[in-house]
Amino acid sequence: MNILLLLMLLTSIILLVILIFLAYNEIMEKPTSSCITPAPESQSISPDQTTQLQTTTPVTSTPSNPTPTTIIPNLPPTLNPLSEIVSNGDNVLQQQQSLINGDFAASIQLDGNLCISNTKNQSVLWCSNSAELGQAPYFLLLRSDGNMCIQDSHNNPTWCSGVIGGQSPWKATLQSDGDLCINDYLGQELWCATRKLPN
């Protein structure tokens, strides 16, 4: 009986040490406040809450050149940064989060604008021009039909890529050239942020 109690105590101590180790690693991996280098007339970024997702009717808008509210974050280094989101609903890009590939980052700003920037030379390549539409916080997801949308806190779409078609599942990838593209399961490129694709 004493051996059984001793084994239970030893197991409890080991579990406690593991939990403390995991909690310490989680705290150490969370970035502290990052420095923001704003473009003219920009706003600073602060952490926001996440939101639960629901399917809504898509809104389509045509993206154009970056807006004056564009900010370029100096992103803290991460061990395994995301460079893509997939249509299975597991990956959602929240405000303060970025897709990263080399010197390029695609980020959701506090005003609801999705922007692609070159973090090395602090330039903006493309923005969705969806600033101040809907109500913060905003998030980006790739829906189950292949349409990539920014949604507000009420799950209303404020901007969508307009892509519907191809083979499921879809993948939105920030490429090494800084373009954000949607491909279907077969690898067919259906939409890209900064270049026109043939119909």
From Swiss-Prot:
Gene Ontology terms: cellular component: extracellular region
Compositionally biased residues, Polar residues: 35-48
Keyword field: Glycoprotein, Lectin, Secreted, Signal
Main location: secreted
Lineage summary: Viruses, Varidnaviria, Bamfordvirae, Nucleocytoviricota, Megaviricetes
Protein name: Putative lectin L633
Residue ranges annotated for the Bulb-type lectin domain, each copy included: 84-195
Subcellular location per the Swiss-Prot or TrEMBL entry: Secreted
Gene3D superfamilies: Bulb-type lectin domain
Superkingdom of source: Viruses
PROSITE patterns assigned to the protein according to its UniProt record, in alphabetical order: BULB_LECTIN
Glycosylation sites: N121
Signal peptide start and end residues: 1-25
Alphabetized InterPro entries for the sequence: Bulb-type_lectin_dom (IPR001480), Bulb-type_lectin_dom_sf (IPR036426)
Comp. bias regions, Low complexity: 49-73
GO molecular function: carbohydrate binding
Residue ranges, annotated region (Disordered): 35-74
